Amino acid sequence: MSVGVPNRPAPDGNQRAAEIEARIAESRRELAELYALRGHEAATADRPAIADFSTGAPSESVQPPSTHSRAKRLIRTGRDVLRHVWRSPTALFADVERYFARSKHQSQQWSNSTTGRVAVEERLQDVWPLNVEIRTGLAPTLNVLLPSLRKQDLTGGPNTALNLTYRLAARGVPVRYIATDQELDSDASFLHAHLRAVSGIDETVDDVQFISGRNRGRTLVLGADDVLCGTAWWTAQMIKEIQPRLRSQRFLYLIQDFEPAMYAWSTKQALALETYGLDFQGIICGRLLADFLASERVGRFCEPGFLDSCATFEPAVDPQRFAPRFDAMARRKKQLLFYARPQAPRNLFELGLVALKQAAAQGAFPPAEWELGFIGSDDELPTADLGGGVLIKSHPWRDYESYARLLQSADVGLSLMLSPHTSYPPLEMAACGATVVTNTFAVKTSARLRAISTNLLPVEPRVEDIVAGLLAAVERADQLPERFAGAMLDVPPDWDAALDPVLPRILEIWNACRGR
């Protein structure tokens, strides 16, 4: 099912293209009035600013009520041009109309607070199209769309995308990384070093670019022969709007989880599901996830032979970073780490916390012997009192190396995710020698998890089962030989072993997308 305004075909011929570009240029100043929402307040809310088309800068003020008639006229007469500029969902117009209708009756509230502006942006931010200009005669480039390239956001999933595509760059594919949701860090020089670190490639590859597409008033120039790569469902939706304007009608889609399940039955779930039916070549992280997509028969995965045409690789766990450390375990107190992300419902934060409280009530974590910690969140979580003097203290995310050192101090891990994907934290904890309580889901069965590592203790995602798993993990804390043996995971030992076998297939896909 397609959601939003139907795609218009790209104009045929230079004359038609010039006419449309002229219409867009003439309309931008008027459209700036329609979208004059305060950019710096949106940035404070950490959401993409709605930019002034005429200057490329965030607009400075919300339009006063005197502009309502003009705005209404622009909405009525500017839709065709808007579609050429944004190719945006119908919800865009409905929200803008609702914005002006509400502000007309509550102008004081809207002019003095960010409530309304943020509400509009919250509804649109995940499907806000990139502002691109397509030019002919440019060398083909692989454009990798990532939500963020900020240092604090480069964790497991984004790092896998960077690792994979940087290896393509090292094999001669020009690569441009586009951050769709965030500006780059003020000092983005670390990115080249980060790419070398996550890929294990010592030399810096020259033909690599980093740009931000967050400011939609700033035009991004793409070549007509470029190929796009989506790394999350909303980046695939952005690609859907650009693809008809490129020569290639197919894009690369790196799928690392079943993202529709991250949302209730909703617009976002519908949009995420829709991406599996687009014209893409799949790159799938993990056979578990590939099997789940095939079993659910979503989108193109119901087509005979489609799964076989995808490139599927198993995630690696870096043994240089994630391995047991004797000195970290030779301490007075044992440690439990809970991968706690309250902002991510699929990580079952509440279920895990209730289970920990019940396990503590059964005497699992005597305060004189155990320390408990939250990990996985960017922000510091409040200390949780489980009763009986048992506290869970927060370890906010700092960087990847600090995260690895922290895992090496764990005796027990609790890492839940209601997904067919294993996720990285349970594997990384297990590789560091911890006994990890993690949940099963669909094709992610107990047998398949235990085949990866005996340090994984799979349970059903029920409170009583998680409690039983925690009690068993605590009993195993002193069994160091068994824990060290379980640290040898049945996954690729490094990213060379994980990705090198599938790179030839991905290069074939790259060439096929370019019509070669």
Residue map of PLM features:
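Active-site proximal beta-strand in glycosyltransferases
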Residues: C229, P244-A261, Y276, I283
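Conserved catalytic-core segment of nucleotide-activated headgroup transferases in glycan assembly
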Residues: T160, A290-R300, F306-G388, I392-Y400
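Membrane-proximal helix-turn-helix segments that form the acceptor-binding/catalytic region
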Residues: G217-A224, S266-I284
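Short alpha-helical donor nucleotide-sugar binding micro-motif in glycosyltransferases
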Residues: A404-A410
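A charged, aromatic-enriched C-terminal amphipathic alpha-helix characteristic of glycosyltransferases
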Residues: P461, E475-G515
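Short hydrophobic beta-strand element within catalytic cores of glycosyltransferases
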Residues: T435-F441
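Aromatic "clamp/platform" in nucleotide-sugar-dependent glycosyltransferases that forms part
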Residues: M417-L418
